[in-house]
Amino acid sequence: MGACDFRCCTCLPLFVVMFGDSPNDLLNNLNEEHPLVVAVEYISKEESADVAAGSASAKHGVTGILAVQGAFAEHAAMLDRLGAPWKLLRAAEDFDDSIDRVILPGGESTTQGKLLRSTGLFEPIAAHIAAGKPVFGTCAGMILLARKLDNDSNIYFGALDAVVRRNAYGRQLGSFAATADFGSSSGDSAVLVEPGERVPGFADSASGAGSTTEISSDSIVLKDFPLVFIRGPFVAEVGSAATVETSLSGNVVGLRQGKILATAFHPELTDDTRIHELFLSL
């Protein structure tokens, strides 16, 4: 396999996040419904919508997406594909009683940490997490959630029982993509969800139909999930309260702890909605 400059269709998400733009000729080669095209359209707008109501069939509350910095538009685009309502969180007053789950996107964790404080969003999000409500952190979001960082003295929410190493995979030009299963269950208890299939709990709630068989989200294993790393962290130490959901070459890159999901990679930069479906089913 030859060297890649991250401008091919496979690696284009890395190019967009690293350089903040994308070559139009490559975007033109993608289907107009491709999540990357949708996300770039969000980013390109001078003023994007701060709220999306979601489809009438969606049975989910509103997902608040931290939108002070980072890849929040890509998460919003992914939720739009699933018909799930969302709201961008830019200031403390944006966090209201409609929010029943939160996404902490990738970006620059130190900058996000400072902006969380200056916008007044830190306290309501911390209270949300302390109440045991669902939260999903990707890349920088994992760093914000960690109990401790092994190469940084900052501690943010400190809710995830893990020690995380910032920028463990090095510089942005060292970013890469891989594939691995996501889920800790094994044997007969595992419910395998192949690429292109819906996560059971999400599929039932989105259709409005009740499930005839109760399936715990703990038992779900997402087969062959695409992992996109952009100067990502990994988990240096896993505490007893957290469960390893996925590893790559011996490094832990996905954790779950109750209703906390955390990934070192960026599922929002792929066309695979399964982790977002899993999050919405918590």
Describe the residue ranges of each PLM region.
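Redox-cofactor binding/interface segments in oxidoreductases and associated redox assembly factors
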Residues: I103-L104, G137, T263
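Cysteine-nucleophile active-site neighborhood
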Residues: E108-A190, A206-A209
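Solvent-exposed alpha-helices and their adjacent loops that cap or buttress functional pockets
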Residues: A56-K59, D94-D96, A127-H128, F136, ...
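N-terminal beta1-alpha1 cap of cysteine-dependent amidohydrolase-like domains
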Residues: G2-S118, E123-H128, S186, V193-T213, ...
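C-terminal and late-domain segments of enzyme folds
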Residues: A39-I43, S175, S189, V199-S219, ...
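A secondary-structure boundary/capping signal
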Residues: V68, T138-A140, L160, R231, ...
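Hydrophobic anchor at the start of a short beta-strand
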Residues: W86-K87, V135, I260
